[in-house]
Amino acid sequence: MNRFATLLLALLVTSPLYAQALQVAKPDTIPDRPEKLVFSELDFTVPDGDTYRHQLPNGVVVYVAEDHTLPLVSLNVMLKVGSYLESAEQVGLAGLTGSLIRSGGTESLAPRDFDEQVEFLASSLSSSGEGTSASAGARSITPAVEESLALFFDMLRHPRFDLERLEVEKSNAIEAMRQRNDDADAILGREWSWLLYGHDYYASRRMTKNNLDGINREDLRAFHAKYWRPENMIVSVSGDVETDAILASLERGFADWPGSGASNRWPPPGPTHVVVPGVYHVEKDIPQGKVLIGHLVPQWTDWSNPDRAALQVMDHILGGSGFTSRIMKRVRSDEGLAYSAGSDFSFDSFQPGTFTVSFQSKNETVALAAKISLEEVRRTQEELVGDEELEVAKGSLIQSFPRRFDSAGQIASTFAYDTFIGRSHDYWQRWREQVGDVTADDVRRVAQRYLKPDEVVLLLVGKWDEIAKGDPEGRASMNNFFGGKVIHLPLRDPLTLEPLAGK
């Protein structure tokens, strides 16, 4: 057990809160029937995001949420940096840069020495790079905050990008590539992103060995120097801090690190690929076919649009609420075709989002499960949902809403993300009212407007001979979709992503 875990355990064991949690309820206070349980009325006030917002002299926005329950502090830096800034020849550069900032040491400390100092402080530091964002984080016990921040800013500002650690990262990446075709879900996700966004879009590009071989230490240094800059950063801090004190510490950390004034093409560009609806298949000898059905939905930038609340209620009813959703009830509970089935209406601020139905089923029942799922999509467009179904969905969403602000960390990170995507903090003040105002007519209206069951991409990974025939009772086959036409996609070389011969 490392020092951080040991100290945390000691704090928990001696905490009055922990002791209270261990107290056993008296038997006479426990009702003998579930329906006799009495709950206090939910009284929750949404925090005011502006009260947590601060700005450093160099322009960096910081959100601070104090919580003195335990002597722990968390800090996260979110950056408007990601793989959308890579060239097509250097796919993976943003991710490698993000990873090596933490693992590759600093100019003054070799990786092992840096790791030892972090461990000695019982701290945890991290960094990463993704599609439209990068991040760096620190966790520390309160007595070690200043020393941890010193290491954190050394890492953030002066990464070494150690050559040996870079080779380790590359070796790990190649090993991960070699396993790409072992997992049907990985194949499904890869082909799905290409079908919806195209091969050349940053969000769907996949790193190859050639890409990896073409990235060197100087590329990482250049990417960091150009984009990991204060003007691209938003900071959130939570835990056992005094706001004025932590702001002063951050100001010192950012001292002498001015913004470059260079643009990083924010927001990221949208895709130009034209989606072609139809049935697509990748052959793989597995007992259960993996299935995704769906289409793109509009990019979401108008956060005041009440359609968002109606769509969340609609998706909750259709397939987003687990065992209570329509798709799950029919596909699993009624027909026993899958362990899990559902839908997801995904909102994205930087590119078109997706509406997706997903499940896995025996190869011979894939067609029937797909047919039933699309029937439920159409039913949501054609019929008004029932009053009870509507109220349960709205109640579930509203009752779970306070969990978004359960902790100081969630408060700070939620409001920081608002700033990241350009969403007003007032959005949260209006959200519950908007959900509560959703009617059955609203659910049907947004289903008709945003769902396109006749224009879906239906992607399958599995044994085509079994999938095509359909279920033994003849209730559905792949002839039910797009006139029986199918495009067979090749299995790809895991290192080059070129089609494998004969596959």
What feature does the model see in each segment?
Residues 111-119, 160-178, 242, 261-276, ...:
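Acidic/histidine-enriched alpha-helical segments
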Residues 103-109, 139-170, 321-322, 346-404, ...:
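M16/insulysin-pitrilysin zinc metalloprotease superfamily fold
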Residues 38-76:
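Mature N-terminal segment immediately following signal peptide/propeptide cleavage
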Residues 22-32, 37, 199, 234-301, ...:
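An aromatic/glycine/proline-enriched structural segment found at the starts
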Residues 21-35, 148, 180-230, 250-253, ...:
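Scaffold signal of the M16-like zinc-metallopeptidase fold and its non-catalytic homologs
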Residues 74-139, 182, 202-206, 321-337, ...:
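M16/MPP (pitrilysin/insulinase) zinc-metallopeptidase core fold and M16-derived inactive scaffolds
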Residues 83, 292-296, 319-361, 414:
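A structural supersecondary motif
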